[in-house]
Regions:
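Structural/interface elements that position substrates and couple domains in central-metabolism enzymes
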Residues: 1-440
Length: 440
């Protein structure tokens, strides 16, 4: 099938590339001409495992193209996917400016002789956005244009997005016509995964509800972790005991510094706003957000309690990306920690395997020193803070680390190190919701 993806950011590029890998002919469109030139050269502007090799492969065989023109791209396409940003407004609502602009451009480019088109919202949008997209197309398109609107939310996890697209848990297709539903089912025919057929409104709401529920699990286990810290219980054992119940599962019951990134914070706020707009206070989600917003502050309080005064203390931070296997620092808890540490006068050094370049514009003005080597980052540090769960940090050479630090004190915000291993080397170790290890 011939497909157009409008928006060549994280979602659009990954989706378009994986569709090409399935055998479709795909044109990814973006109004950033520099980005288009970069993509045409075979380079990609983001770090995502497996993505760059698939881009190069599918460009080489002619299944994947990049263009700055919506009008030229959609003429031969059967399906047009909208995958543009939907950033949050200050009140938590979603800014649909890009959606509206792209919808108008699509409408103005559509002609009756192009035949039937299916226009798909891939971006995360509030419920009933599909109705507005349909109204906009009808208003700006010429007469006799045939189209349908579909909602097909993405459920990609940064760091494993390619696998999530090619081997999804489920595919949600929201359509109000059988013809549109059948077209999108053809798009996904190469993938063997359960398909949930819904109306457009339900599909739009599923995305916000799903992400908000996952955020709820994270905040729940972080609240449990605080109880564990006061009682000497181990939150990892708690999570195992809870997660062994098949009705709950172990996934996302990982105590730590909280969630970040471009999806969970935005989607939780948006769902709260949607509910509030409908006159339905969603106090449960408001508490989920509150727990997450204060989790890193609680962690910082523990560091301060241990050091007494943070001013002029050298503190090393391992990890800047909001999670492992990405260079994305949007809403990264690590950066929030760095900001607060610097604000109290600490001397902060930081490192990350992939996110140094994305974090630098934010951290350099704070005075954070960025160091490529993780051990050099920790040299002479009084405390090491682990803020991102990179495997490099989980597998650190503890003897080497002990040799470069001024004090053998670690605050592990992601619970990736073994207390027993640290005890054997003589570290003082504090994590989230687990008993601390005192210095030997």
């Amino acid at each position: 099938m011939n497909l157009t993806i409008i928006g060549s950011g994280y979602v659009g590029l990954t989706t378009g590339t994986c569709f090409a890998e399935m055998g479709h002919h795909v044109i990814c469109v973006d109004n950033n001409t520099e980005k288009i030139r970069t993509l045409q050269s075979g380079a990609i502007p983001i770090y995502e495992p497996k993505l760059e090799e698939l881009v190069k492969k599918n460009v080489a065989v002619g299944r994947l193209e990049f263009s700055p023109s919506i009008a030229a791209s959609i003429a031969e396409s059967e399906v047009i996917f909208i995958a543009v940003p939907t950033p949050p407004n200050t009140d938590g609502s979603v800014d649909l400016t890009y959606i509206e602009k792209v919808t108008r451009e699509i409408a103005q480019a559509l002609q009756p002789e192009m035949g039937y088109k299916v226009i798909v919202d891939k971006s995360t949008v509030p419920v009933k956005t599909g109705e507005k997209v349909s109204q906009t197309i009808k208003h700006y398109a010429g007469p006799n244009v045939q189209f349908d609107i579909v909602s097909n939310p993405e459920f990609l996890r940064e760091g494993c997005a390619v696998d999530d697209l090619l081997h999804p848990d489920r595919i949600v297709i929201g359509a109000n016509s059988e013809q549109a539903m059948n077209v999108i089912k053809r798009v996904y025919q190469p993938i063997h995964a359960p398909i949930l057929e819904t109306d457009v409104n339900s599909a739009e709401l599923i995305k916000h509800a799903a992400n908000s529920f996952l955020a709820l699990k994270i905040s729940y286990i972080n609240a449990v972790a605080k109880v564990c810290e006061k009682t000497g219980a181990d939150v990892e054992l708690m999570a195992e005991g809870i997660g062994m119940d098949k009705r709950i599962s172990r996934h996302f019951l990982n105590a730590g510094l909280g969630y970040g990134g471009s999806c969970f914070p935005k989607d939780v706020k948006a769902f709260i706003n949607i509910s509030r707009t409908l006159g339905i206070p969603f106090t449960l989600l408001e508490e989920v957000e509150h727990i997450n917003d204060t989790q890193h502050i609680h962690f910082l309080d523990r560091i301060r309690d241990r050091l007494w005064v943070l001013k002029d203390k050298k503190i090393a931070v391992w990890g800047l990306a909001f999670k492992q296997n990405t260079d994305d620092v949007r809403e990264s808890i690590a950066l929030k920690l760095c900001e607060k540490l610097c604000g109290e006068g600490a001397i902060v050094t930081a490192t990350d395997p992939k996110a140094m370049h994305t974090a630098a514009p934010i951290l350099n003005p704070m005075g954070v020193k960025l160091v490529e080597d993780m051990y050099e980052c920790a040299r002479d540090a009084e405390v090491l803070v682990i803020a991102t769960e990179w495997s490099e940090y989980a597998n650190a050479d503890l003897q080497k680390l002990a040799g470069v630090m001024r004090n053998r004190i670690i605050f592990d915000g992601r619970n990736i190190l073994s207390p027993a291993n640290l005890r054997a080397v003589g570290f003082e170790y504090h994590s989230v919701g687990r008993p601390s290890v005192e210095e030997a």
